[in-house]
């Protein structure tokens, strides 16, 4: 036995994304599967919204730059708190939370912004549209998973 750390280890996945383990939580496998699927979509959207807030935060220009810079940073932090709560809920249901930003970018419903800097009005509009997209999906998901008992 050695006290040296075991570096550069890579093991096989112990649970694939999109699967749920059986847990004694009085909720059917199908209900947990569907809930995890919908929650992962919301999680990906929220991760993407966090990144969008930071992009706007860093790219702020003009006379309201300072105030919006602070506001966007506050909202970005709130998104991070939601990301953690959503991911933990997926795990609680026996699922695997989407944790890789590349994976989140593939499953998000929030449109990708341009790579450059937009004007302030476009940034605000893009953020509002992203929130509306997420809210519509969350409302639909909540209704459907409630119908399954979750």
Curated annotation (Swiss-Prot):
Coiled coil: none annotated. Pfam families: Ferritin. Gene3D superfamilies: 1.20.1260.10. InterPro entries: DPS_DNA-bd (IPR002177), DPS_DNA-bd_CS (IPR023188), Ferritin-like (IPR012347), Ferritin-like_SF (IPR009078), Ferritin_DPS_dom (IPR008331). SUPFAM superfamilies: Ferritin-like. Belongs to the Dps family. This is Uncharacterized protein in bpoA2 5'region. It comes from Kitasatospora aureofaciens.
